[in-house]
Amino acid sequence: MRSHSCGDLRSDAIDSTVLLSGWVDRRRDHGGVIFIDLRDRSGTVQITVDPDLGAEAFAVAEHLRNETVLQVEGRVRARPDESRNERLATGEVEVLAQRLKVLNAPSRNLPFAVSVHDDEQVREELRLRHRYLDLRRERMRRNLSLRHQTVQTARRFLEDEGFIEVETPVLTRSTPEGARDYLVPSRVCGGEWFALPQSPQLFKQLLMVGGLERYYQVARCFRDEDLRADRQPEFTQLDMEMSFLDQEQILDLNERLIGRIWKLVKGVELSLPLPRMTWHEAMERYGTDRPDTRYGMELVGVSDIVADMGFKVFSGAVAAGGSVKCITVPGGNDKVSNVRIKPGGDVFSEAQKAGAGGLAFIRVRDGGEIDTIGAIKDNLSDEKKAQLLQRTGAEPGSLILFGAGDTATVNKALDRVRQYLAKELEMVPAEAWNFLWVVDFPMFEFNADENRLEALHHPFCAANPEDLGDDPALWSERLPTARAQAYDLVLNGLELGGGSLRIHDAALQNQVLQTIGLAQEEAQEQFGFLLEALEMGAPPHGGIAFGLDRMVMLLAGEESIRDTIAFPKTQQARCLMTSAPGGASDKQLEELHVASTWVEPEEN
């Protein structure tokens, strides 16, 4: 139905006859001659319909609507110099139509304009409800093409490195230590349930036990969790696992993979090796394990300076075992008013969202003198002022914001304020790609609600041998404070991927499961197949998974992963196009041995 794609025509096709098929992007009537922008996936080309050269074609062109599916036969010619369009890849040529055939025409009004010439901002709800139309738009075509290019680049790289692609089950069993599972009732095994995988974690480890050595998969994963702009109930991971490599070898391989993707997809040459930072350093300097290193305003600890101050907010926090930290905002003296920092202000609100009661502050005036208000002013001696200036390195014109309280809350609040002010004050450089490996995570964190330890990543991460030692009798004592051989790749403050070396010893895996509160019987019920496999000669192995949706979002310069997925869900986990999820008939539920207890809420 076509000899060429619309976007492929160039000057070397001049004087040739072509057959094109696509959509009418725009139609313009210029005093008897009609111009049509014909669009397909490859791009757009101008069609010229002259009644003197094709009366039948002109009669068809007079009645065309935008988004009509049209076939065009015609001759390629050079555009006149004055009408060439350098913004269009096909802008040097046009097709003089000899025959037009309508393949299909819209029979109803379109909910929004699709044309690449129309900059209309369409509500996301409308775009998702009519996603098949939205996919015709240049933005979505470009994003999905970029996604394809990213996946193909990764596949070629991994295959060159000796990896093989293996699919793992989508119907599996529910396991603890993760988000909520999506459950699928079994018709054959009444009263029993499958779970959709949150990741291929256990299966890829079993592939290593099976001797495959290097595995990868573009894996579909499912998590029933509260959604944000960068989360979906179903998402895609570039997942891999490898045997007989240590942590540095895994990091080296994966940063070469990332370097290849950024070079071929974005034309950006990354400087390798990528920087490393320990989890402890990241928390101290940035208050988060996903630090954005494109700008300054790092957190600075000042607990030792303010511990003996009369200002109770500071001294009380230190006495209670907490911390006092601060960030220095360059130029903040003039740009951030007191009103914004006090209750009701936007900066105060950001700190409050992170659990902080508020922020203290001092200003460094243009002459270098320190100015502040309230109780902190009455208790800030000249000696303390000098110590704070030296510790923070604050220049004249700066604003110093303080957080005080338990360390976790202080870190979270100052991290949030730091990110907020960096955007507000336009401190984030454009087109910066700041990659960072964060390493040496703790193996466990304390869950105060359940009064137990839980795995920070997952309970299959290997411990740092320096912390664990060689004596199994000491594992139970040393594991709670051990570092994991885990690593996350962070880009511009977002987690791009994460992984670890895995436990390949059954006794140690059992001990870790006990550490997170699983009794022996429960561990066997949940993970017996893995523990059995580890007893049969499991090799040292490790892996990583990259969030493909988020990676493409960053490569495409989008704000939401929904703009990098063909058919995404909303933040309420609904598909507006198909109205999924939907109900099930009584017969279907009966076959599945399931009864619904859902009661529609009463309308007020």
Swiss-Prot record:
It comes from the Bacteria. Pfam families: GAD (PF02938), tRNA-synt_2 (PF00152), tRNA_anti-codon (PF01336). Residues 201-204 are annotated as: Aspartate. One of its GO terms (biological process) is aspartyl-tRNA aminoacylation. L-aspartate binds at E177, R223, H457, R502. The keyword Metal-binding does not apply. It catalyses: tRNA(Asx) + L-aspartate + ATP = L-aspartyl-tRNA(Asx) + AMP + diphosphate. Its main location: cytoplasm. GO terms for molecular function: aspartate-tRNA ligase activity; aspartate-tRNA(Asn) ligase activity; ATP binding; nucleic acid binding. PANTHER family: ASPARTATE--TRNA LIGASE, MITOCHONDRIAL, ASPARTYL/LYSYL-TRNA SYNTHETASE. This is Aspartate--tRNA(Asp/Asn) ligase. The lineage of its organism: Bacteria, Bacillati, Cyanobacteriota, Cyanophyceae, Synechococcales. The gene is aspS.
